[in-house]
Amino acid sequence: MTVIQPVALRFMVGARTLASVRRRLVRVPLTLAEARQGACPELPPLPQEAQGYLITSLPETQHTALGRAGMLGAVRQRYTRFHIDLSLGFDAWFAGLSANSRQGLKRKARRIDAEVHRFRTAEELAIFHPLARALSARTYQERLLGGGLPDDLAGLQRLAAADAVRAWLLVRDGRAIAYLCCPADGDTLLYAHVGHDPAFAAHSPGAVLQLEALRDLFAEGRFAWFDFTEGEGQHKRQMASGGVACVDLMLLRPTLANRALIAALAGFDGSVALAKRVVRRLGAEGIARRVRRG
């Protein structure tokens, strides 16, 4: 069944959305396995009420192959879809990180002096969810990106009944300061819901919790892959064992409004890219980062 979703096409500077325009699109997401295989998806017929497609994690090598006659194409994002091969074993994976990364992670873990709590059953997730949900409400992921932990505890418990979710909390002095909640897609665990208390940002609680979660996953042996999903970031790049060059490709019906929208997005994104280059030349990255996050 083809699902049509309202998609907000955002005019963004860093994590800050300045404006957005909505289009009803058929979303075609590729899994990590499909991206790694270099797959080119077969698009479903476009319903009359839909204005186009949004294909996510399309291997960059398939970008031109997916062109559809008469449709307007626009790349919304280019990134590496990072992942970790969990068959490597913890020691081999950790040895594959840069020396600076290894030393930094060890130092952060010692400095933060916190406990890791682990959750996988339906009963355990009933304890995890309210604590993580309260923490999520304070994170920039939820406040600025709308990417917080969902309210749906029942959904998490259904996943737990199928042994298809893992979750962790980092707790310091009885207070949850970071959470990680990862549903599974077959043998792949997804980096889906993550956040930390802004008051502890200087201690890198998310990185510390991620390291301990990976230690658990390597030891458990239940999953073959850890998927950092769409988009990039220093944290993902630092910990990944590999990645696939991907694009998010939007295909729209060739209406006048859609032509104007694509031109506006291209012009705005080009201006942001130019501004970033100027900021780098001036050495003002720190100031720009604070402005983007507000």
Give a label for each model feature:
Residues 66-71, 98-100, 132, 148, ...:
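Generic preference for flexible, low-structure residues
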Residues 1-21, 58-84, 88-202:
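A conserved beta-strand-loop-helix scaffold within acyl/acetyltransferase catalytic domains
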Residues 2-18, 22-24, 70-91, 224-283, ...:
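Active-site/acyl-donor-binding loops of N-acyltransferases
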Residues 12-74, 186-244, 251:
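Acyl-donor binding region in acyl/amide transferases
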